[in-house]
A protein has these predicted regions:
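Catalytic domains that recognize anionic headgroups
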Residues: 1-214
């Protein structure tokens, strides 16, 4: 964004956006902006959701955290009905990996959630881990077609938070803890994957762990 502290101009590696936010910046650059949210933050009937969805030309709130199939159908319809020559900015908030860790066709019941704030009889770190991993694997299969359409574009996959599964007596998120602040980040810039390089601190952490077994 303009005045964000990055002084470079448009180049082969970057370009500058101007606007109230990133989505507005892409719209001003001529992009078709398409977005879909699953978690309640994006509920367009709320004040917060209306603010988050307003910058998009097209936006769909799924209504719950287990509607990825509907979201992908809606996005595909938007892509088919817009000018294929116009660049697209697509935002997708996936809910299945969010509590209660459930996806369409899952072999377990949606409720009770294995992870709730402050704990409870239904809480289980083992179930939380296995169900979230299963949801992630299912999501991978569903996203394949959409990602393939943008394989030569810039793609960013991340999470807004992690979850606590009993660490230090804590559960779920909405709290400051290393488990909630650790998130995945995968990037492909203009078709090329970004490979991370180990930092000195990470290298020392690996060495310290190895020493425990020597």
């Amino acid at each position: 964004m303009t005045f964000s502290g990055h002084s470079s101009q448009d180049s082969d590696l970057s370009f500058r956006l101007e606007g109230a936010n990133i989505i507005d910046g892409f719209r001003r650059r001529g992009y078709q902006t398409i977005g879909s949210g699953a978690v309640e933050w994006f509920n367009t009937s709320t004040e917060t959701g209306s603010v988050l969805s307003k910058p998009f030309e097209h936006f769909f709130f799924a209504g719950n955290t287990w509607s990825l199939s509907l979201q992908l159908e809606w996005i595909e319809e938007c892509l088919l009905t817009t000018n294929p020559e116009q660049p697209r900015f697509v935002f997708l908030n996936v809910g299945e990996t969010h509590v209660p860790y459930w996806h369409d066709g899952a072999s377990w019941d949606r409720w009770p959630s294995p992870c709730i704030p402050f704990g409870g009889d239904s809480c289980s770190a083992v179930l939380s881990s296995s169900r979230q991993r299963n949801c992630l694997e299912w999501v991978d299969t569903q996203l394949a077609n959409l990602l393939d359409q943008f394989k030569e574009s810039t793609i960013l996959i991340c999470s807004d938070h992690g979850d606590c599964w009993g660490e230090d007596g804590l559960r779920e998120h909405g709290i400051s803890h290393p488990s909630t602040l650790t998130v995945p980040l995968i990037m492909r810039v203009r078709g090329q994957p970004i490979i991370s390089t180990p930092t000195p601190s990470r290298f020392h952490n690996v060495l310290s762990r190895l020493r425990r077994f020597l």
